[in-house]
């Protein structure tokens, strides 16, 4: 599987409806660390004053942000994570269950030791367990995981 090497490239590759789902999820509960970047992207995209962008309802903010193809690397990463946490928890849970990794509704639980990289065999088996999910969603999820920790998830690029 060929992965996009940056979150921004992955974000650009998503269809508009997927970007809207991600932006809507983001604005439901915006991360304080990324809220400023998101508002800056809105200001730039629509040439708005910052206070006007802040005053928009969340659904309008989401519609605008979904059209921004280069929101910046950290914001793109946050949007991708929000897409999966809001809309695709069953996919996340199925993947982590197949790997035997502890999680809470698809979110890895804190580990006391640094995580070991996933073996190519385990990655192949876990991806095979996701056969009931849409292929494009699986590929986006795997690419997002890989972007978060390339060393741990290196085997995913070989699947």
Each language-model region and where it sits:
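Short, charged, intrinsically disordered terminal tails
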Residues: 151-159
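Acidic, low-complexity, intrinsically disordered interaction modules
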Residues: 29-144
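Charged, amphipathic alpha-helical stretches
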Residues: 2-35
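Short, solvent-exposed coil/turn linker segments
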Residues: 7-10, 74, 129, 155
